[in-house]
């Protein structure tokens, strides 16, 4: 699901002689075939830890070089004296850049309890001003979700909060249900 990145990488690979760098997108079947092929000497994988363990185990049989970019779980820690108006855009960018689908995206925000209402009031206001659209359009704040699985995962996070009697706020506007 990192198709955009690999397309860009394939364009960069054209700067090298043919066969030096090969970029192939595919599902598990293609990935495992490449992983077990003796001609493949190096594997770069972006994804989750469970799949990375399988790749590493299989790659070890032929002592292949491996490089992983695994999903992060990064917090934003808000200090007592933070000027919310001044820094809220940085917090939002850290959370929603590429629709939040980057490994270093902020997954949770810790706010001093006595400032939580103030923080979330400003955050809620700014997020309601978001415009979802084509990511290269300067008027858009955020592009679309990368794939249906990610979309469903995000929806399940909100449902889980509600099921556990936590506060969940829906902000922004809905776009057509692309995945139906």
Model-derived regions: residue spans:
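Short beta->alpha connector loops at strand-helix junctions that form conserved
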Residues: 1, 25, 46, 79-80
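N-terminal Rossmann NAD(P)-binding subdomain characteristic of aldehyde/semialdehyde dehydrogenases
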Residues: 14-25, 165
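Solvent-exposed polar/charged
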Residues: 14, 36, 57-61
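Short alpha-helical
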Residues: 3-4, 11, 28-30, 49-51, ...
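Conserved small-residue-rich beta-alpha loop and adjacent elements
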Residues: 1-17, 63, 85
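ALDH superfamily catalytic-core signature
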Residues: 19, 42, 48-180
């Amino acid at each position: 699901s990192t198709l955009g990145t690999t397309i860009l990488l394939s364009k960069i690979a054209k700067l090298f002689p043919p066969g030096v760098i090969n970029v192939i997108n595919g599902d598990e079947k293609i990935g495992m075939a490449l992983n077990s092929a003796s001609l493949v000497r190096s594997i770069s994988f972006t994804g989750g830890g469970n799949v990375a363990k399988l790749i590493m185990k299989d790659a070890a049989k032929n002592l292949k070089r491996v490089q992983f970019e695994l999903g992060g779980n990064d917090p934003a820690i808000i200090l007592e004296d933070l000027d919310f108006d001044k820094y809220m855009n940085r917090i939002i960018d850290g959370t929603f850049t590429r629709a939040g689908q980057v490994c270093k995206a902020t997954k949770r925000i810790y706010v001093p309890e006595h400032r939580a209402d103030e923080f979330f009031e400003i955050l809620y206001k700014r997020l309601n001003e978001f415009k979802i659209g084509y990511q290269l359009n300067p008027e858009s704040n955020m592009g679309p979700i990368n794939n249906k699985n990610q979309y469903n995962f995000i929806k399940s996070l909100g449902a889980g909060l509600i099921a556990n009697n936590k506060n969940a706020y829906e902000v922004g506007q809905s776009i057509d249900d692309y995945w139906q």
